[in-house]
UniProtKB/Swiss-Prot annotation:
Homodimer. Belongs to the UPP synthase family. Mg(2+) binds at D36, E223. Keywords: Magnesium, Metal-binding, Transferase. Its cofactor is Mg(2+). This is Isoprenyl transferase.
């Protein structure tokens, strides 16, 4: 668990305390979130889909700050998938503009809160101005000591695995790597998430029971919490419920519960 970052007395007064129902010693180090339901939230309120995406940004800002305050080490969110380009052009253009606007508005505050921002995905396909902002945000916050905030943008899990395989193949062709030495550790080292541990907890909003091509390798042993809450409505209570659910699990990583031994009864 990462120690919450407080900058001066003013910052200390703004930290949201961890709910008493959550064990601070058993927090997940890394939380991943599939932020789903912006469009349905807007449709239910008879609002334009753009309003749903804007409301989703507010939910993300609150969730990020709570995770930072509560000592979560890494937060990785699925912001824009490689498949999202197939959405209507107007919606895609709005999302790109929204990314740019939010980065410009929030970067200074996030830097003051010691958030370290990274963007994971095929960033070369993004608009040039957005790429420039992403580079600025990454460079500005690279030395921060707060939560690691990964924004998966133009990201696809299968694409990430293919690129990792291509990198390994290139190393073999160049004579830098013996194929017999390739193992899980070597493969994971070529992934976009190679600098930190895999997610402990995956949260998916909107009730959908799928992972949607998100972190296919990294989610191998993650605990999964699915909530019917639409992403714009996700709040501190929603996050608390997810953490309580996580702490109720016995993580066995393919093994068995050491407190249970049925063979003694045979």
């Amino acid at each position: 668990m990462k120690t919450p970052i407080a900058i001066g007395a003013e910052k200390k007064s703004l930290i949201t305390p961890l709910p008493a129902s959550i064990d601070p010693l058993r927090l997940p180090e890394h939380i991943a979130i599939i932020m789903d339901g912006n469009g349905r939230w807007a449709n239910a309120k008879k609002l334009p889909r753009a309003m749903g995406h804007s409301a989703g940004v507010d939910a993300l800002k609150q969730t990020l700050r709570l995770c930072n305050d509560w000592g979560i080490g890494v937060l990785t969110v699925y912001a824009f998938s490689t498949e999202n380009w197939s959405r209507p052009k107007e919606e895609v253009n709005f999302l790109m503009t929204l990314f740019e606007r939010v980065l410009k508005k929030e970067l200074e505050a996030l830097n003051l809160e010691e958030v370290q921002i990274s963007f994971l995905g095929d960033l070369d396909q993004l608009p040039t101005r957005l790429q420039d902002l992403i580079n600025e945000a990454t460079e500005l916050t690279s030395g921060n000591n707060g939560i690691r905030f990964n924004v998966c943008t133009n990201y696809g899990g299968r694409r990430e695995l293919v690129l990792a395989a291509q990198k390994l193949a290139q190393r073999v062709l160049q004579g830098d790597l013996d194929p017999s030495f390739i193992d899980e550790h070597t493969f994971a080292g070529e992934l976009l998430t190679s600098s930190y541990a895999d997610p402990d907890l995956l949260i998916r909003t909107s009730g959908e029971m799928r992972i949607s091509n998100f972190l296919l390798w990294q989610l191998a042993y993650a605990e999964i919490h699915v909530t019917d809450t639409l992403w714009p409505d996700f709040d501190s209570i929603s996050l608390t419920k997810a953490l309580i659910d996580y702490q109720s699990r016995r993580r066995r990583f393919g093994g068995v519960d050491p407190t249970v031994n049925d063979y003694d009864q045979v």
